[in-house]
């Protein structure tokens, strides 16, 4: 039998990560591999079964903070140059107590009331986008709806002026590109993003507005505030993790519904099922297909596998969400599925702070789309669908549809 070897940048994984991860889940659920990145090689582990993923997400022997296991020279090789190292200094890259402090400060600007107050605005944005789509019989869901909706929402939430949003979109697209060949373009986008955010932070310190940046700048607890670098990191995290995962949910979720006509019809007839439908789309599509940036802080043995200090840990979210030992008929989309304990938003102290916003956008977007265009159909062969090049985030390049029969 051919020895399994995980290639995160390989064509097979890019085309269908669920199939690749599923094979590891069945044959080698705890898989050691060598990660080649930016000219260096790192020992790593791929975890693919639900119970094992949960165990590693809970394990205190696993750190999110690379500084706990690597020196500055190693970090520089793995990551990016010092002027943009804020990308690895956000709260998802911290353990307690640093994580607790950061999350507490950020939560002040991201309360449930803040999110719920966005409902009317999100509904209005969705309807305006659908109005534009209605002018034609065909559309690209990604270009016309799935990408602009969360982008406009996050831009308004942050207080990004309308005249700056096209450039902001360019930076965002570049920052989520994980292909090694585009490293310098990504780094340049990060530098420009940082310079732009620095100006906004400066303005909000002097003259606060009713936006997220102002709230983050002025958030305080026990005399502690977010530093300049922490502000860059948090806003980077918000844009990359918050924006792209929602774009992926809306795009891949629409594709999943169009490919499962019975479930799509069920949702059209019973829009009150939207909450369970969105949870199932989160499970089935896994907008974050894999979580990385975790390291063992000490040597330990797990189920007979010898894990060494400094080993990288990859959590196969997309595989855990389709584990037949945990989900009944996991390869089938079932919008009635309940309970649905997917881990698309992570687990524990690093559970996604933006989950309520992503869910709200999903509820509004799918209901509005299916109500406006009940006859929407896929306008391209499934094999011709193009996926974005990102090892960790699963998203579509485009999704051509016909809007009426």
UniProtKB/Swiss-Prot annotation:
Q: In which pathway does it act?
A: Antibiotic biosynthesis; bacillaene biosynthesis
* Coiled-coil portions: none
Q: Does the keyword Cell membrane apply?
A: yes
Pfam families named in the record: p450
Q: Per its record, what are the GO molecular function terms?
A: heme binding; iron ion binding; monooxygenase activity; oxidoreductase activity, acting on paired donors, with incorporation or reduction of molecular oxygen
Q: List the subcellular locations.
A: Cell membrane
Task: Quote the InterPro entries the UniProt record gives.
Answer: Cyt_P450 (IPR001128), Cyt_P450_B (IPR002397), Cyt_P450_CS (IPR017972), Cyt_P450_sf (IPR036396)
Name its GO BP terms in alphabetical order: antibiotic biosynthetic process
Is Oxidoreductase set as a keyword in this record?
A: yes
Q: What class of enzyme is it?
A: oxidoreductase
Topology versus the membrane: Single-pass membrane protein
Q: Which CDD domains match?
A: CYP107-like (cd11029)
Q: Of which family is this protein a member?
A: Belongs to the cytochrome P450 family.
Give the protein's biological function: Involved in the metabolism of the antibiotic polyketide bacillaene which is involved in secondary metabolism. The substrate is dihydrobacillaene.
Q: What is this protein called?
A: Polyketide biosynthesis cytochrome P450 PksS
Q: Which organism is it from?
A: Bacillus subtilis (strain 168)
Which gene codes for it?
Answer: pksS
């Amino acid at each position: 039998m051919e020895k399994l070897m995980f290639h995160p940048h390989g064509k097979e994984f890019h085309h269908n990560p669920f199939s690749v991860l599923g094979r590891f889940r069945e044959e080698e659920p705890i898989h050691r591999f060598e990660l080649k990145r930016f000219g260096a090689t790192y020992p790593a582990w791929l975890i693919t079964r639900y119970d094992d993923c949960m165990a590693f997400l809970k394990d205190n022997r696993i750190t999110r903070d690379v500084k706990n296991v690597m020196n500055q020279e190693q970090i520089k090789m793995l990551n990016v140059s010092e002027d943009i190292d804020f990308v690895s200094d956000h709260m998802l890259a911290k353990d307690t107590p640093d994580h607790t402090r950061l999350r507490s400060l950020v939560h002040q600007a991201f309360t449930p009331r803040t999110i719920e107050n966005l409902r009317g605005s999100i509904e209005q944005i969705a309807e305006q986008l659908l109005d534009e789509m209605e002018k034609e019989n065909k559309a690209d869901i990604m270009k016309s709806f799935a990408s602009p909706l969360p982008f406009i929402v996050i831009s308004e939430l942050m207080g990004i002026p309308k005249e700056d949003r096209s450039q902001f979109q360019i930076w965002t697209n570049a920052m989520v590109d994980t292909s090694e060949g585009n490293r310098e373009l990504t780094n340049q986008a990060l530098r420009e993003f940082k310079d732009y955010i620095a100006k906004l932070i400066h303005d909000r310190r002097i003259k606060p507005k009713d936006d997220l940046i102002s709230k983050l700048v002025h958030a305080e607890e026990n005399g502690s505030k977010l530093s300049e670098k922490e502000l860059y990191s948090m806003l980077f995290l918000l844009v990359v993790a918050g924006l792209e995962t929602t774009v992926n949910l809306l795009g891949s979720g629409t594709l999943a519904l169009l490919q499962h006509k019975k479930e799509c019809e069920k949702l059209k007839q019973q829009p009150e099922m939207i909450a369970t439908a969105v949870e199932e789309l989160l499970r089935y599509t896994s907008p974050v297909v894999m979580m990385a940036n975790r390291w063992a802080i000490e040597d330990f043995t797990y189920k007979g596998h010898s894990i060494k200090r400094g080993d990288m840990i990859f959590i196969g979210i997309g595989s855990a969400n389709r584990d037949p030992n945990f989900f009944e008929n996991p390869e089938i989309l079932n919008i009635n599925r309940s309970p649905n304990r997917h881990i698309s938003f992570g687990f524990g102290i690093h559970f996604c702070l933006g989950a309520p916003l992503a869910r709200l956008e999903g509820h509004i977007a799918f209901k509005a789309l299916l109500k406006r265009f009940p006859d929407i159909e896929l306008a391209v062969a499934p094999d011709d669908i193009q996926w974005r090049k990102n090892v960790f985030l699963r998203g579509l390049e485009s999704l051509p549809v016909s809007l009426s029969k």
